[in-house]
Amino acid sequence: MASTKDRENFVYIAKLAEQAERYEEMVDSMKNVANLDVELTIEERNLLSVGYKNVIGARRASWRILSSIEQKEESKGNDVNAKRIKEYRHKVETELSNICIDVMRVIDEHLIPSAAAGESTVFYYKMKGDYYRYLAEFKTGNEKKEAGDQSMKAYESATTAAEAELPPTHPIRLGLALNFSVFYYEILNSPERACHLAKQAFDEAISELDTLNEESYKDSTLIMQLLRDNLTLWTSDIPEDGEDSQKANGTAKFGGGDDAE
């Protein structure tokens, strides 16, 4: 059984790794804390999230760049180069899959079972929804549908907990609404539902803005700005008749909207 001193050491190493931009080691240290099966502090929770976000973020950026180059090569008829890029893209996709599987295991086996506070429960289900969404960004066919279904399920669980436990101005509840709306837009190709969710979250937060404490004011208002930016971007995609637009190939748009940590 690890001692309090061990836990403090893991957290300190994670902070060092973050400053040194060694995010894989940051994740490893915070996984050691998660494996203790204790309720993580807000600081520990954020360290774990930031570590994984950077590890996955680098690969997501690589995948988008490779996909864009691949499309250009295909449009030029450069089949040999397109094949090379496809093979390289699959390597990145394997890394993405492995990271997401690792996140799910930590969340399901350690974080959710150890979560006592409502805020923690929302945070972890939101995180689960995010990483299934990242899988759905590049998976195809049945695997894409399965990842999308699991992402939806996790976001819905997070939303139920958030509405019961957190005020509309809470940054975690706002971040959840932001990311869930991005899921509707990018994965389900539904700008109408994305806008509805984002607008509802924004309006509810605005109506209670005077209750916002100074501590979370900056975080909450930043996410509200992102919600508004996405609404502006997405509104133009809603057809005149109000029906959801379904993109023929079912692939996510690159840069379809901002999401939260």
Swiss-Prot record:
Pfam families cross-referenced by the UniProt entry: 14-3-3
GO MF, any single term? calcium ion binding
Q: Which GO terms describe its biological process?
A: post-embryonic root development
Q: Where is this region: Disordered?
A: 237-261
Q: Which family does it belong to?
A: Belongs to the 14-3-3 family.
Official protein name in the record = 14-3-3-like protein B
Q: Which organism is it from?
A: Vicia faba (Broad bean)
